[in-house]
Structures are given as C-alpha cells and as structure tokens.
C-alpha cells in the first residue's frame, strides 16, 4: 500500500490547452526534451523536411502540420512522473479535446502573447471551469513583438474570470527581449537566441540590481517601475486558490527558443496536484484504494499500420494495474483479461508492466469498449462526467457504390465511437447524417473510410444546423412528441433520440412548445 501512495504522489497528469498556432506542440516538444524523452526537438513548421513533431503522428497531421488526435506521453521530470495529454490545437477537433480534459488533474494554458486570449482557449477554459481544474499559464513568443504583459494579465483575468499571479516577469520583448526576472527569488535569467533544439544553461544573475549592465540602463529603469507596479497590482501566488481553479500562476518566455519552459515545468511539477479522487454514480473513489478502477475517455483506431487495431485510452483512478490482471467491464458485466496494455510516446508503443492512479494506459479493443466505459476489479461503479457534445456542422453521406452500404454503416459507427464525429439515422428515411464540431473531421472520415474500410463516399448538404438530445421522464409525453416531430427526429450511433433542427428559431419554437421535454446540448457517455 505504501508503494501505491509513493507512486501516486509522483504523478502529474495534465493537458495543454491553447488556440491553434499558440505554440502548444512546440512547448510539448521542449518538455519532452527536458524530460530526456527525445534528444532534439523537431520544429513543427518544418513538416516537409521530414522532421515531424513527435506528438503529430497520423498521416493527415503530418501533411497539414496540425495535431488531430490526442497523444499521450509519459516522461520523468524532477523526480515526478509526468503524464502529458497533447490535445488537438486545430479548432476542428474540439470534441476530442473537451473529453481529454475529463482525464486530467490540471492543465497548462499556452497564450500567444502577440495575439492575447483567443476564442478557442476561452471555450477550453470553460470546460476546465466545469471541474474547477487548476490552470498554469505560459505566455509564449516573447522573442517577438508582443502585447503589453500587464494588458495580457488583465485580459486573462477579465475574459477567463481567473486571478493571475505572475511568477516571473519579461524583460523587454522582440529584438529587445533580454530575459525574465523571477519575482519570488529575485533572480534574472538572461536570454540568448539560437538554442531551440537543445537544453541550454542560460546565465542567471542573483539580484535585479546586479543585472543592470546586461539589461541596459533605459530598459532597466522601465523594468524597475514595471515590477513595482506588478508587485502592487497583481495577485500573489496562493496554492489553495490555485488548487480550487481560482488563480493561475503565470510564466513568460518563448517555447521556440526553449526559454522559460524549464522554469514553468519546475513550477508546474511543484504546485500541480497529484491524482485526485473521482466521482462515480455510486460513491467517491479515492486514489489510494488498493483495487484498480478507471474509465475510457478516448478510442483511437489503427494507431499502427502494422497492427490495424483500436486502442482504448484508459485513465487509472485508483489501485495498481499489473500485466495479465482481470478487470470487470461495468457496462457489459463481463470480466476481461488485460495482458498487453500499452504506454505511449506519441505513436511509439511499449507494453506496460504496471500503472498507478493518474497514468493513462492503452487497452486493445476489438469493438467491445466504448468511450465512457468504466472498469473495476469487480465492484459495479460508473464514473461520471465524460461528455458527448452536440455537433455543429452536418452533412448527408453519399455512397459511391450502393452495394457497400453495410461496410459504410459499420465504418461510420466505429469511427463515431472514437468520438470525433457522430452518426444520425433519421426516423423516417434511410439517410445517414454525419455531424461534427468542425469541417476537417469530414475529410478525416472520408479518408479513413477509403483506407480502412475500402468504402468511397462523398457528402452533400443537409438542412440541419443544430442537434439536441431529447430526454423526458413522462413516456406518454415523449411518445406524443415523437409523433408530432418525427420529421426532425433521429437516433444517434448509441441509440439516443436526437432532435435535428434546421434553424435556431425552429429549435427555440420546439422548446417553447414542449416545456416538459429536455433538449440537451451534451449527454454523458
């Protein structure tokens, strides 16, 4: 039991959230560099050179230079075991990202300091807010001409409704970026360009006054005034407020040049929480219980061309995973032997011998495991809070070869089980409607249907703009509703009744006329 406690105390499981192009994949690479997980960082933009970022591994990602599917990377840092869940930065893959945030204990928010807080980051922060997830912030790209740092803090506080506690402070920006000043240890770290691919021992000077010559007189005078202002106007770091999700420690730097990342990582591994207890429908599960429990938050098909398999990403919530153990599948009521669970390094797979609360392991899945499934060592527990989000874009699927209808249905349902798209079968037609949160997912589905299921399809427009899941406790009212609105009703891939609305006005009218019917934008898996 002591071993379990020791291992849990080491774990830090988190995701990175940001707007596309804020530098998330770059910062991921630098963390792996510091954790000795990779030897040199591949720069993300240089896709054509064959140096692909480690965490972008699906063919389409390599072609387009974006992270589509969530990768999981485990590496050691400062005596801790870091589980980093890399989430898609591209806005088309937000559903996958939202769900990943249910499997972490904290998050790192990367802000492009040139642009400030952007739309996508706001959406992701709102998901973090649902669970009061502790957030660490990294203001990136200070080797470029950025917004004023005080203005950036104000913007985060104003839009994200979270207090900011700057841990260090940038000295200049762009061509005049000289480094950062540690507000708590009175230490200056001086910036030099050109060390993005390696770990470089940047020069440190104890005491702000001792760095005046290196900073330059004019910039130094401005800096002193700015620091006085920051100390007076900003919040001090408070561990309790941070753990409640009320305050975020803020670090400044430039991930591309590998500057400021180490300081942020040191702070993160010090302050971020170890794995936390989790709610189930039956009771609270504590991490130090000796029986294994956990849930599946993602399914990824064909992670490896050689294996043609599907992997369920399983977050351990308590106990210890040991190779070859039998676990109980709560939804099916069956026992299942796990002999070859995997640990990940972005597409590089290794068999895992053991795992503890906070770890993410991969279970081989031949179609029996779904997103949201819970596993235990026998107790009937169902973990809460793994959401399905209503899609925002819809298309009708057109099959090029009508004889392949069965293969198309199978492919669409299997791909929808991964959670990036959803399939709807209207009550009164044989159409298949595909829904997604972003346009790019339709390309991904067409490409994967062709390569994995040998089915060619195309899309056409469909008169649907919103989807809402329908719930009602009164069976008679629900049946009346079904008869009256059958033209708008479909069943999703999991068999849930869904209202597909052509317009927002149509949806509002249906809601107004049916106060006893719940129209929900999310449903639990």
From Swiss-Prot:
One of its GO terms (molecular function) is guanosine tetraphosphate binding. Residues 9-276 form the tr-type G domain. GO terms for biological process: regulation of translational termination. Keywords: Cytoplasm, GTP-binding, Nucleotide-binding, Protein biosynthesis. The keyword Cytoplasm applies. PROSITE patterns: G_TR_1, G_TR_2. It is found in: Cytoplasm. SUPFAM superfamilies: EF-G C-terminal domain-like (SSF54980), P-loop containing nucleoside triphosphate hydrolases (SSF52540), Translation proteins (SSF50447). InterPro entries: EF-G-like_DII, EFG_III/V, G_TR_CS, P-loop_NTPase, PrfC, RF3_C, RF3_dom_3_sf, RF3_GTP-bd. GO terms for cellular component: cytosol. Its main location: cytoplasm. GTP binds at residues 18-25, 86-90, 140-143. The keyword Cytoplasm applies. HAMAP family: Rel_fac_3. Increases the formation of ribosomal termination complexes and stimulates activities of RF-1 and RF-2. It binds guanine nucleotides and has strong preference for UGA stop codons. It may interact directly with the ribosome. The stimulation of RF-1 and RF-2 is significantly reduced by GTP and GDP, but not by GMP. Belongs to the TRAFAC class translation factor GTPase superfamily. Classic translation factor GTPase family. PrfC subfamily. This is Peptide chain release factor 3. It comes from Francisella philomiragia subsp. philomiragia (strain ATCC 25017 / CCUG 19701 / FSC 153 / O#319-036). The gene is prfC.
């Amino acid at each position: 039991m002591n071993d379990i406690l020791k291992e849990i105390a080491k774990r830090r499981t988190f995701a990175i959230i940001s707007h596309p192009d804020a530098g998330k994949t770059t910062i991921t690479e630098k963390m792996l560099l510091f954790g000795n997980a990779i030897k040199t960082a591949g720069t993300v933009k240089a896709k054509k050179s064959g140096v692909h970022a480690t965490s972008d591994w699906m063919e389409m990602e390599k072609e387009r230079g974006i992270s589509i599917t969530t990768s999981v990377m485990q590496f050691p840092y400062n005596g801790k075991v870091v589980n980093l869940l890399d989430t898609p930065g591209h806005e088309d893959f937000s559903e996958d990202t939202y769900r990943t945030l249910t499997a972490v204990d904290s998050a790192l928010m990367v802000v492009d300091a040139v642009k400030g807080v952007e739309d996508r980051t706001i959406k992701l922060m709102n998901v973090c807010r649902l669970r009061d997830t502790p957030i660490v912030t990294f203001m990136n790209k200070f080797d470029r001409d950025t917004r004023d740092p005080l203005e950036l803090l104000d913007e985060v506080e104003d839009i994200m409704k979270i207090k900011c506690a700057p841990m260090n402070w940038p000295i200049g920006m762009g061509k005049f970026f000289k480094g950062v000043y540690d507000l708590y240890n009175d230490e200056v770290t001086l910036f030099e360009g050109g060390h993005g691919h390696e770990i470089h021992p940047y020069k440190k000077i104890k005491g702000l006054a001792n760095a005046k010559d290196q900073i330059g007189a004019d910039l130094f005078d401005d800096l002193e005034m700015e620091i006085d202002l920051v100390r007076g106007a900003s919040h001090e770091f408070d561990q309790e407020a941070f753990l409640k999700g009320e305050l975020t420690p803020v670090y400044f730097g430039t991930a591309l040049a590998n500057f400021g990342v180490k300081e942020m990582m040191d702070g993160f591994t010090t302050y971020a929480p170890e794995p936390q207890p989790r709610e189930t429908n039956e009771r609270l599960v504590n991490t130090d219980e000796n029986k294994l429990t956990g849930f599946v938050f993602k399914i990824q098909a064909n992670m490896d061309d050689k294996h043609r398999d599907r992997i369920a990403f399983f977050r351990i919530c308590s106990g210890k995973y040991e190779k070859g153990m039998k676990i109980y599948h709560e939804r099916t009521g069956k026992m299942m032997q796990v002999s070859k669970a995997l640990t990940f390094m972005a597409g590089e797979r290794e068999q895992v011998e053991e795992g503890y609360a906070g770890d993410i392991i991969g279970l081989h899945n031949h179609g029996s495991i779904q997103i949201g499934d819970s596993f235990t060592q026998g107790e009937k527990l169902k973990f809460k809070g793994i959401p399905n989000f209503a899609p925002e874009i819809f298309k009708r699927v057109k099959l090029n070869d009508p004889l392949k209808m069965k293969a198309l249905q199978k492919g669409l349902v299997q791909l929808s089980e991964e959670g990036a798209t959803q399939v709807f079968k209207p009550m009164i037609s044989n159409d298949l409607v595909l829904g997604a949160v972003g346009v790019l997912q339709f390309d991904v589905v067409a490409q994967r249907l062709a390569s994995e299921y040998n089915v060619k399809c195309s899309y056409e427009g469909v008169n649907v703009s919103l989807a809402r899941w329908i719930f009602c406790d009164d069976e008679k009212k629900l049946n009346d509703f079904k008869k009256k609105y059958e033209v708008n009703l479909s069943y999703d891939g999991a068999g849930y009744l869904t209202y597909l609305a052509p317009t927002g006005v149509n949806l509002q009218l249906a809601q107004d006329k049916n106060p006893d019917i719940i129209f929900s934008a999310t449903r639990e898996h």
